[in-house]
Structures are given as structure tokens and as C-alpha cells.
């Protein structure tokens, strides 16, 4: 595939992934209990909500950083970023599995996300 044809796909996917992480972060900040349930490990109603706020802030920051890199750096920089942040959904897969979440959520959401992020890194490195 020619680089000219590949660039919109690679950058488009990077933008979608980054915006999705911004959305997840905002959701954890605004409706933390619902966001935790969607993550695959429901939060205890009497639990410490500070951890959900921390997750929301970190996800929001990761998403905004991704968008900034897309806007102001090279494809290689964005590719390295995607390669590194793929560790997050891989770790999320293990967290869900070790804390009573379903295999469907662990692999269908988190592991699948890691695969898409790694695929995006490969597309960006190819530019």
C-alpha cells in the first residue's frame, strides 16, 4: 500500500483511539460508578472514589497527549507513543481477569483494544 493512501488510515485511527481515551477519561470523572462497571470490574459503592478519579484523569491525559502528538509531531513519534500505551489495555486485560471480571470483557474489550493500538503503531511506523 502506498504511503499516501496509508496516511489517512493510520492518522485517522490514531485520532479515533485518542478521542476514545479522552471519552473514557471524562466518563470516569463524570460518572465513575458506571464507567467502572463498563471497564469490567464494578466499583464498590462504599469504596474510595479517589481511585476512579485518578483513572479518569490519567485516561483523559493520555488521550489529550495522543492528540497533541498527532497534531504537532511526526508519524514515528505517534507510533512510539501507541506502541508504549498499548501496555495499558494489555494490563487492563490482566486486571479484569484477576478481579472477577469476565473473559469476554477482558479479551473482547481490553485485549482487542491492545491489538488495535499495536496495529495502529505498525501503520504509523510504515509511513
Locations of regions flagged by a protein language model:
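Structural signature of hydrophobic alpha-helical transmembrane segments
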Residues: 17-19, 75-86
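Helix-coil boundary and interhelical linker segments in multi-pass alpha-helical membrane proteins
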Residues: 1-13, 68-78, 121-127
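Non-cytosolic membrane-interface motifs at loop->transmembrane helix junctions
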Residues: 11, 104-112
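N-terminal signal-anchor transmembrane alpha helix
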Residues: 10-30
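Membrane-helix boundary connector in multi-pass membrane proteins
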Residues: 72-73, 91-107, 125-127
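Cytosolic, membrane-interface loops and tails of multi-pass inner-membrane proteins
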Residues: 30-49
